[in-house]
Swiss-Prot record:
The active site is at 385. The keyword Protease applies. Binds 1 zinc ion. It is an enzyme of class 3 (hydrolase). It comes from Mycoplasma pneumoniae (strain ATCC 29342 / M129 / Subtype 1). One of its GO terms (molecular function) is metalloendopeptidase activity. GO terms for biological process: proteolysis. Belongs to the peptidase M3B family. Zn(2+) binds at residues 384, 388, 391. The gene is pepF. InterPro entries: OligopepF_N_dom, OligoPept_F_C, Pept_M3A_M3B_dom, Peptidase_M3B. The lineage of its organism: Bacteria, Bacillati, Mycoplasmatota, Mycoplasmoidales, Mycoplasmoidaceae. This is Oligoendopeptidase F homolog. Keywords: Hydrolase, Metal-binding, Metalloprotease, Protease, Zinc. Its EC number is 3.4.24.-. Its cofactor is Zn(2+).
């Protein structure tokens, strides 16, 4: 791979070998154990300060080492040297945890004296870290149970491991046969490629085979998912929480009722979702010259640009699109390009998605992995991931602790950049190029509903399934599909009677079987509803920044710079947005409706043009 288009991960090793970094990490770890000495480090302020400073040194080294390993693994999942190093690192972490099994107990025991130490301005930066531990005081597990849990931790998440095999190696990836030609399928994404093909017959054939992917393993996947939820419920109760969702809400420093509030706000988008789906089908019917748009027609790219889109073009366009962020922000983006923060190109055994790294304390390169496909879609991916990386840059510049944003609001920075791309397109294409305006807005509207309506349907499915488990029921595949199917009534304005009838049909059940294969459900964190938060806030911020709102720009820089130093909803309030009130949700909904009207106008222009 051309070094120009590959990331410079070697900077993470500080000029040393991988083995030398691991040796240093183990040596520092031994020093940490000796200094900790069963809680002796809390007995004097001097020892306490020395312990914190050593922990920081270890954290920085560990961030560098673990990021190097995880990124090299993403670069080539079959690299034996890296896989061996990852295994050794995981074993080291597990053994290390046993020494600190009573760490929280000692923090609670020495809370009064630690609070006194933290009055020193030099130590004030650590205050939030300790407060987050102390608020868990009533949820602590006794030391004996904690030690037992640490010892059996390798046996945890067996349902997750079974799911990973079922959803990868054991997937029913059947070839697509069409007009005597066999299309070999190596990954689920291969079906998507065929669904984007110009040949409608091939698309239909691919769609029908795609429906069968999860059908043979539907019952096993269902058992795996339910057992995963039972484990999560059990661990939550072990920590004296009412249930798994309540535990996640506690960890996020929110009232559990806020989750239901989000459900109701997104449910109010349902009529707009239904109207957009109708408009979308009309557009596909017109552009593709169809009698009726079918499910296998709706993935075909509309109005694709001709010719290859280059990485250099993407870099130039990204700088134009992100101009409303100001000169400092743009300089960071230029640094990302110049200092090779980005792994650009697809490669054999490379992770197929895109991400920006986390655990960034002590780093000065905030790496991005992507798979540039020579289309403008990669520009959207680029600005999205740059949003995360520049967020890391700002947090690192202004905070010494609590740098990484929580998943609760992490997507705001990336969605905001996507919106700047959308508004850039509106300015360039409105009343000039209806085809490209439709393409851009259709993508953005679909992303909006994907992050709100679709993710809330997933989240509602999780909540409803967990309620049955809390009632000592074990839902089977049929029950899970019924739960998911009925979420369309609330979030997509689907007809209740029609859904009830369709749920009795095998074909419809097959189309919903993927609900048992969502990896997010195994994360151990009830979080998919949070995508709606990122989308709604990102929309409001992006709209104002695009319009040149200097007050919002200043607020946005404060938001980026805050890291995770505040509770999540308080962090979002730095933007002047209170998500516990309906107004922000209504404002985002109004903007969504404005986009749809722009699409309707452009579609009329397109129809008039072709007469």
């Amino acid at each position: 791979m051309n070094n120009q288009y590959n990331w410079n991960l070697e900077v993470l090793l500080n000029g040393k070998s991988l083995a030398d970094n691991f040796t240093e990490l183990k040596q520092l770890s031994e020093q940490e154990k000796a200094l900790y000495d069963g809680g002796a480090c809390f007995q004097t302020k001097a020892k306490f300060t020395e312990f914190l400073q050593l922990q920081e040194k270890i954290e920085v080294l560990e961030n560098r080492y673990s990021n190097f390993l995880s990124n090299k693994h993403a670069e080539n999942s079959l690299d034996k040297t890296i896989n061996d190093a990852l295994f050794q690192y995981e074993m080291f972490k597990s053994e290390h945890a046993l020494v600190f099994v009573d760490f929280e107990k000692n923090l609670f025991k020495h809370e009064k004296v630690i609070r006194a130490y933290l009055q020193d301005p030099a130590l004030k930066q650590y205050q939030r870290d300790f407060e987050l531990v102390w608020r868990n005081k009533k949820h602590q597990i006794d030391p004996a149970s904690q030690k037992l849990l640490a010892q059996i931790s390798p046996a945890w998440n067996q349902a997750d491991k079974i799911f990973n095999v079922l959803s990868t190696a054991d997937l029913n990836l059947q070839p697509v046969v069409y007009k005597g030609k066999t299309y070999v399928i190596n990954a689920v994404s291969d079906y998507q490629s065929l669904l984007e093909n110009k040949d409608r017959g091939l698309r239909e054939a691919a769609y029908k085979v795609w429906l069968e992917i999860y059908w043979p393993t539907r019952n096993t996947l269902s058992v795996s998912l339910v057992e995963n939820y039972i484990q999560l419920e059990t661990f939550a109760k072990l920590k004296k929480h009412p249930n798994y969702i309540a535990k996640t809400a506690f960890d996020d420093e929110i009232d559990v009722a806020f989750i239901d509030f989000v459900y109701e706000q997104v449910a109010s988008f349902a009529p707009t979702f239904k109207a957009f789906q109708s408009l979308r089908k009309q557009i596909y019917k017109h552009v593709l010259k169809l009698d009726k748009a079918q499910p296998w027609d709706l993935s075909v790219p509309l109005f694709k640009a001709s010719g290859d889109y280059t990485i250099e073009q993407a870099q130039t366009d990204a700088l134009k699109i992100l101009a409303p962020m100001g000169s400092e922000y743009l300089e960071v983006v230029k640094e990302a390009f110049r200092e090779r923060w980005i792994s650009w190109l697809p490669d054999k055994n490379k992770y197929t998605g895109a991400y920006s790294i986390s655990n960034v304390k002590g780093l000065d390169h905030y790496f991005i992995l992507m798979n540039f496909d020579k289309t403008r879609a990669s520009l959207n991916t680029l600005v999205h991931e740059l949003g995360h990386s520049v967020h890391s840059w700002y947090a690192s510049k202004y905070q010494t602790q609590n740098l990484d944003p929580t998943i609760f609001y992490a997507e705001i920075a990336s969605i905001c950049n996507e919106l700047l791309l959308c508004y850039h397109d509106i300015i360039n294409y409105e009343n000039r190029n209806p085809q490209q305006l439709i393409r851009s807005l259709m993508e953005q509207i679909s992303h909006f509903f994907g992050a709100t309506t679709r993710q809330l349907m997933f989240s509602q499915f999780e909540q409803d399934t967990l309620k049955l488990i809390q009632q000592n029921q074990k839902p089977d595949f049929k029950t899970l599909v019924e739960i998911y199917g009925k979420t369309a009534i609330k979030y997509q304005a689907a007809n209740a009677d029609a859904i009830t009838k369709k749920l009795k049909q095998t074909k419809y059940q097959k189309s919903l079987a993927y609900i048992t294969s969502i990896p997010h459900f195994y994360a151990g964190n009830f979080y998919v509803y949070k995508y709606a938060i990122g989308q709604v806030v990102g929309t409001l911020v992006g709209k104002k920044l695009s319009a040149g709102d200097s007050n919002m720009l200043a607020a946005y820089k404060r938001f980026l710079s805050s890291g995770s130093t505040l509770p999540p909803l308080e962090t979002i309030k730095l933007l002047g947005i209170d998500l516990t009130q309906p107004e922000p949700w209504q404002e985002a909904h109004a903007e969504l409706k404005r986009w749809i009207k722009l699409v309707q106008t452009a579609f009329k222009q397109l129809q008039h043009k072709k007469r």
